Amino acid sequence: MRKEFLFTSESVTEGHPDKMADQISDAILDYIIERDPKARVACETLLSNGFCVIAGELKTTTYAPMQEIAREVIREIGYTDALYGFDYRSAGILNGVGEQSPDINQGVDREDGEIGAGDQGLMFGYACRETETLMPLPIFLSHKITEGLAKARKDGTLPFLRPDGKSQVTVRYVDGKPVGIDTIVVSTQHAPDVSQERLRDAVIEEIVYKVLPKEYLGDDIRFFVNPTGKFVIGGPQGDAGLTGRKIIVDSYGGSCPHGGGAFSGKDPSKVDRSGAYAARYVAKNLVASGVCDKATIQIAYAIGVVEPVSILVDTHGTGKVEDDQLETCVRQLFRLTPKGIIESLDLLRPIYKKTASYGHFGRELPEFSWEKTDKAELIKNYFNLK
């Protein structure tokens, strides 16, 4: 590893078009799974200038008023006026959802009570000691800024902000550890009558300096706030939005590999989602146990097959025991079949809309069961660690 380097991650606000799509897809999933926990859901959303298309496949016994759900999500985000680029009242919403293919379903719902993986695929989980939530610092800080943008807009602190926005944080590392922030980029949609100077000062003073840890705020940070100038046209009026296009924002900000599968709109029989949650659960518990300082987990599945086809543990040279021993431990202490993951993490709950903005990982909310470190003591005992 290089002695000194810079690493960058980004986040987007809940009003970013891609995140709007994720939230609509997950709100529909929540509505269905609350009423039919055995439902199979694959819900995709497209947003563009003045309209929204909902597509995908379902197998369920319940009815979901998808247009009403979508309008409520758009309203909650803050698109309540056409001047903002989208209006929940007037947007055209098309429902094109169909029935799940029986060819897929036959491999998932098995007669023996097990659940086969809903598709093939590989998922990654990651944890490190850079933050209290065992997340990489650049993505952690980026999310703090975008959350701050939304809060300042909604509580009236900065009433000239609009829903669409992004952040990006570059962190300086020495000997593999973060030592400070090098660059912060914030782009935020705003009212047409606010000056760029006022906007820049307000974002830095009212958001960045208030939400980021003081130990990382030096006088030499480079700030770029709306570096191209005005950002009045935003939301789906400025860019189309699509479910599953912010998978790096959703995960670890590029600090570890990604298997390529998106999360939102998918019920937990889809291992793209549940497998990634399980991989984070494993990685976080390994680091929390003290057996390593950093862990990358890969899990892979075959469609219709119960057991994972492979499990990999990589502690990047920080482990107190060999990685192959950790793999054996993981296989013994964690249930990594689709059914085992669903049951151990209690995933048949309407918890998913909360995951669809500001990251699926590193947020220790009661609903986010994959953030628990309840296996840490078992791992310590397994290796007789003090």
From Swiss-Prot:
Cofactor note: Binds 2 divalent ions per subunit.
Residues reported in the UniProt entry to bind L-methionine: E57, Q100, D239, K270
UniProt catalytic activity: L-methionine + ATP + H2O = S-adenosyl-L-methionine + phosphate + diphosphate
Enzyme Commission number, as recorded: 2.5.1.6
Flexible loop: annotated span: 100-110
GO cellular component: cytoplasm
Residues binding ATP, per UniProt: H16, D164, G165, K166, K230, F231, D239, R245, K246, A262, K266
GO terms for MF: ATP binding; magnesium ion binding; methionine adenosyltransferase activity
Cofactor: Mg(2+); K(+)
Involved pathway(s): Amino-acid biosynthesis; S-adenosyl-L-methionine biosynthesis; S-adenosyl-L-methionine from L-methionine: step 1/1
The entry's keywords: ATP-binding, Cytoplasm, Magnesium, Metal-binding, Nucleotide-binding, One-carbon metabolism, Potassium, Transferase
Subcellular location per the Swiss-Prot or TrEMBL entry: Cytoplasm
Source organism, top-level taxon: Bacteria
Top-level EC class: transferase
Binding annotation for K(+): E44
GO BP annotation list: one-carbon metabolic process; S-adenosylmethionine biosynthetic process
Purpose: Catalyzes the formation of S-adenosylmethionine (AdoMet) from methionine and ATP. The overall synthetic reaction is composed of two sequential steps, AdoMet formation and the subsequent tripolyphosphate hydrolysis which occurs prior to release of AdoMet from the enzyme.
Oligomer and partners: Homotetramer; dimer of dimers.
Family indicated by similarity: Belongs to the AdoMet synthase family.
Protein name: S-adenosylmethionine synthase
Organism annotation: Wolinella succinogenes (strain ATCC 29543 / DSM 1740 / CCUG 13145 / JCM 31913 / LMG 7466 / NCTC 11488 / FDC 602W) (Vibrio succinogenes)
Gene name for this UniProt entry: metK
